[in-house]
């Protein structure tokens, strides 16, 4: 045991020991109209049923995250995000690992959920889909979300994922498949980045400063220590996705791990919480370095400011702060983290296979001190 042992950061929402071979994934958090926080996570690993029927647990806090209570389990829900639309709670994602794309509604703030049995009750698209708890964006009278189509000529991770965006009119019934419009699918092209491109995934639907919807994606590359993101352009009607490989890749700290981007009207800035590679780990696969979590901001989506180091542990093998989902809450940001950390039984299985779900807040985030900046010569179009 050392000085870092057992000092689990944040408020523990759930804990599962590594011995179960079941790990905590896909944190999601949203704020209900009454001010309560609702959080969720799924389960993955050999001890779970992720490939046959995803399972998501839902929690509620009525004291601004100080304590949490489990309120429901959803069987047949995976890699999903919670969100509120017109004062009603929804959850959206695949039915299992690479399952159908579905959506559920709860009229009692997360205790009971609708069943997506057909195309009029939440079964949006049959097939194989991939995503994470990604943001919903309102723009031009529509609700937008990025996902990935996972049906391909191969089952290889990364190569099977095609970028796409799905959207629906704000006044439509979100449980009806017919309400949703999808773009074409843009498959992984391994010739990109001089043959070093491995995947794009976990895209964010984001509205650019000039009012265009883009899909801002995590990128996996064969180049050690390289953090990149990809910018896919989406047509105004939500039907066409297009990509220019000569301009569409940008250097983006944290781009090799999942991140979420949201726009704050008050500061007129885009914000994200992402992983940052620390000194001494630049020779590693960037996607495997998750021991440092930072807050960043940008006015243009290409040049980013480092505002605050949120979480850090010197070890990268069995410690990780990852897959953060977050929300603005007045002057603060609240966030939920998939945390691999010490426990009394030897700690997490590894940095990836998390044993904790933890809640955190960033007080007065708009006043966080600027630590550094990351300039990027390649603007998103």
Each model region followed by its residue ranges:
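Catalytic cores of secreted/periplasmic lytic hydrolases that degrade extracellular macromolecules
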Residues: 261
């Amino acid at each position: 045991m050392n000085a870092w042992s057992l000092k689990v950061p944040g408020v523990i929402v759930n804990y599962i020991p590594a011995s179960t071979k079941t790990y905590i994934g896909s944190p999601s958090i949203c704020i209900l109209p009454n001010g309560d926080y609702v959080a969720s996570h799924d389960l993955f690993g050999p001890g779970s049923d992720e490939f046959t029927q995803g399972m998501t647990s839902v929690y509620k806090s009525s004291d601004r995250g100080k304590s949490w209570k489990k309120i429901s389990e959803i069987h047949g829900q995976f890699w999903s995000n919670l969100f509120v639309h017109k004062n009603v709670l929804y959850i959206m994602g695949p039915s299992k690992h690479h399952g159908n794309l579905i959506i559920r509604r709860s009229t009692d703030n997360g205790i009971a959920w609708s069943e997506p049995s057909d195309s009029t009750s939440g079964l949006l698209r049959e097939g194989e889909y991939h995503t994470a708890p990604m943001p919903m964006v309102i723009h031009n009278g529509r609700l937008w979300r990025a996902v990935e189509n996972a049906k391909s000529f191969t089952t290889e991770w990364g190569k099977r994922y095609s970028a796409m965006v799905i959207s629906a009119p704000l006044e439509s019934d979100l449980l009806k498949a017919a309400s949703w419009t999808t773009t074409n699918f843009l498959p992984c092209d391994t010739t990109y980045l001089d043959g070093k491109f491995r995947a794009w995934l976990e895209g964010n639907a984001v509205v650019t400063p000039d009012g265009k919807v883009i899909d801002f994606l995590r990128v996996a590359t064969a180049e050690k220590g390289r953090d990149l993101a990809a910018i896919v352009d989406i047509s105004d009607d939500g039907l066409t996705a297009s990509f220019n490989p000569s301009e569409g890749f940008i250097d983006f700290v944290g781009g090799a791990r999942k991140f979420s981007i949201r726009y704050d009207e008050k500061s007129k800035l885009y914000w994200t919480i992402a992983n940052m590679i620390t000194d001494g780990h630049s020779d590693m696969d960037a996607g495997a370095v998750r021991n440092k979590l930072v807050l960043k901001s940008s006015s243009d989506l290409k040049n980013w400011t480092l505002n605050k180091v949120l979480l850090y542990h010197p070890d990268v093998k069995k410690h990780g702060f990852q897959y953060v989902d977050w929300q603005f809450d007045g002057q603060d940001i609240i966030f939920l983290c998939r945390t691999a950390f010490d426990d009394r039984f030897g700690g997490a299985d590894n940095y990836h296979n998390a044993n904790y779900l933890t809640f955190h807040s960033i007080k007065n985030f708009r006043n966080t001190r600027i630590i550094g900046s990351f300039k990027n010569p390649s603007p998103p179009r």
